[in-house]
Amino acid sequence: DRLRSRGLGDVYKRQVPALIDVQTGKVVNNDYNRLTNYFEVNFREFHGENAPDLYPEELREEIDKLNIWLFHNVNNGVYKTAFARSKEAFWDAYNAFYAALDILEERLGHQRFLFGDYVTDSDVRLYVTLARLDIRYAFQLGHTKQRLIDYKNLWGYARDLYQIPAFKNNTYFKDFANPSNKKAGHLMETFNARFLDEINFDAYWGAPADRAHLSSDPGNKFKIGKR
């Protein structure tokens, strides 16, 4: 009986991201679209000193609009191709995904981050797809129109973000590259599966991004928030 359920976890299937009450073990929120915003606004008093403001009040409406667009065309765009059940659906999703990357490539040609000088919530959302694009999602896209490294601005932008410790320390390339559904003993393993330990991802992603000149505050990537 759903009315007698003790928490969201009793009603819905397990999925991520999810906010867990560590004292009760219950899922208290799994709103993937707004969860980061709750942390940025409602948990502000718990932020550390000099924590960045990823969701500045004056940009929230614009960030919300861009986040919706990013989700439908980029973040979920890859999965639309993967789960397409017809050629028409596949090519619609495929073309929309690469058209979105072209728009972002143009946008990032004249500003360091999506909203100018500082990293925002939108940059975090875009990064998670870019970090997986060449080493994981390319397999789902089939014919790859362009790799991330073929986009001058997007590739530099992705490296600029990666070189922030909070991004780098939470980017697990080996996990991205090694499919979770890999079958043990399968003779036809991917290049990544065969040579994963020999790939120095940091050598590629740690190369200079050369994007500081696009910012009016080149020494800082974050706008510091107020508690």
Each language-model region and where it sits:
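Single conserved hydrophobic/aromatic residue that forms the stacking wall/gate
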Residues: 1-12
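GST-like fold's C-terminal all-alpha helical module
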Residues: 23, 27-172
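Pan-eukaryotic secretory-pathway lumenal catalytic ectodomains of glycan-active enzymes
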Residues: 159, 164-227
